[in-house]
Amino acid sequence: IRDSLVTGVQTCALPISYVDFGGESAVPLVERYPNLLVTGTFSKSRSLAGLRLGYAIGSRELIEGLERIKNSFNSYPVDSLASAVGVAALEDKAYFEACREQVMTTRERTRRRLGDLGFEVLPSQTNFLLVHHPDHEAAQQFVGLRERSILVRHFNTEALRDFMRISIGTEDEMDSLIEAMEAMIR
């Protein structure tokens, strides 16, 4: 990213949607690179997906450019209710930290348990895991979980065909997932 910013890319937009789950934020780079626009959302770590509320951090010039075109491209204008909810979400730091820690703890616990069942679990700093079992097709596991009313994602693309995307839920939900997966592979 730094190379792109230095070598003359006009503008580099970098989403940091999952950074609160353990990633490294690019926000500090904004001061050094005036062509960097960092974007974020309240959908992931703030659990406000239906609100369609996000933000952008960048140089004054980039933000002014966004202001000029926002009504042409933004299909989700921010109303006063969404704005108030966003401010409240930012102010309640204790609740945010508790939820964030719970997701990360549950993610790591789930990762370990899936690993114990023989799954390959890709490293994650998000609120989901990408998992693959060398002896069982992901598409069949996806169907088996759906039949048990457990919803995960399976992408029928070459790069992800062998993987399932498992969103991190409550501990009870993840226990149910593990039990179902264990029953399917045994």
List PLM regions with ranges.
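Short beta-strand-to-loop capping motifs
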Residues: 58, 131-135, 168-170
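PLP-dependent enzyme catalytic core of the Aspartate aminotransferase-like
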Residues: 144-153, 157-186
